[in-house]
Structure formats: structure tokens, C-alpha cells
């Protein structure tokens, strides 16, 4: 496995320049927070990361609150990221968190359904056995967790975040990487604040209008333990049949 300087390489060096732009990979033992509004590209970047990690022989768990297995396969195929072999050989585990409007995981019986989402996730040992765990989107889990919501209403945001952060810290002490995607417009800033504070890598995904063109960029807010130098911004686009494309831009 390629772990130069204790990094998990994002691979695909001949496909795009994402790994190079992010300093050669994600440091082992990191919490990665990726924020962006709806449509900013959080899912596409996290899917690219997942595929790249697997191509470099890391194991990945990908939990999606939006895509089913078939939807995930269709999406990855449209980006030319063929994950079928990785799934079949158990290098990748895909999980769909079917969160219904009642704030419980669908398919659970009544007693199980009353259990807190975060508690159920933390107790799902198989999910956390991979080298890299990606939760897309983490804000959907927070919004639908009854205990978390109750503490937020009591202005106990930090207490609400404390248990899950402690759990994450235990995992990254084993060298694992946890990637969380968040739409900041859907969750209170005070609730997400503690996660921003403890993130080793904090990326903001933005859409910027330039004339009639909408450009996407990754703003690197924090990147602890980087390999090579990481720039402040990385321009990119998402292209069907190609996937993530890193773009060099000059704004006149």
C-alpha cells in the first residue's frame, strides 16, 4: 500500500491532478470535513476520493444518506470510476442510510427505530473496520438524530458533538481517516462548529459565478500534516464520462 510519509494517496495520477493538488494524499489519522452547499460537488469529490483510495489498495466504507446501491453504481459509472471489482473484493463497503422523515433508519422495528442514529452508527463495528470511512452527508445524520436535536434546542451544541468527536478521535488514533461531508445551510452553525474545530483537513467547496460561467473550487481552510505544499484553492469541474477534472484558471 502506498503510504508515503504516512499519507493515504488519492491515486489516479494519470487521470487527474487531485492527489498532487492535495499534497500527495490525506494524512493517516485525520478527520476531513468537506463543506459545501447543495450542488457544490461534495458527493462527486468524496466519490472520487473513495475510488482513488481503493485504487491505491486502501479499504473504504462509503455511507450515503442519498444514494442506494444501484444509484451509487450508476453515479460512479457515469464518472468512469469502476468500483464493481472493489465492491466484489471487499475493498469497498457501500452502505445506504435510508433515513425517513421520522428521523429513524427505515426498515428498523419500532424499538430499534427509537435508538439514536449516531449511537447506531457508532455501534456498527463493520462500518468502521476500513482504513477510510466516508459519510455523505453527515449533516443528514445530525439533523435526524433525536438526542442531538434535543441538545441543540437546549443550546448544548458542544455537549451534543462531544460523544461523536470522542469516538472519531479513538478511530483516528488507529491511523484511520474519516471524511465527513456537510451542507452548512441545513444545520446550525453552532452545531457544526465543534467539528470544524477538530477537523485536521477542512475543505470548503464553492460555486463561483464568472460571467455566465459557474466555476467550482475547493478552498483549503486547513490541512494539517500535508505531504507536499497544498495551495489555497483548487479549481475543478465534474464531467460525465470523465469524473473530476482539475482546472488551471486565470481570472482576468
Model-identified regions with their sequence ranges:
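Conserved inter-motif catalytic segment of the P-loop NTP-binding fold
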Residues: 58-143, 147
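Structural signal for conserved beta-strand scaffold positions within catalytic alpha/beta enzyme cores
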Residues: 94-96, 204, 220-222, 246-248
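The Walker A/P-loop phosphate-binding site
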Residues: 1-79
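Hydrophobic/aromatic beta-strand patches that form the interior of the parallel beta-sheet core
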Residues: 32-34, 61-63, 93-95, 179, ...
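A short acidic, often aromatic-flanked loop/helix-cap motif at beta-alpha or helix-coil junctions
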Residues: 99-105, 211-212, 243-244, 252
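P-loop NTPase motor core
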Residues: 113-114, 118-197
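C-terminal regions of RecA-like/P-loop NTPase motor modules
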Residues: 1-6, 226-252
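Phosphate-binding/switch region of NTP-binding enzymes
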Residues: 176-240
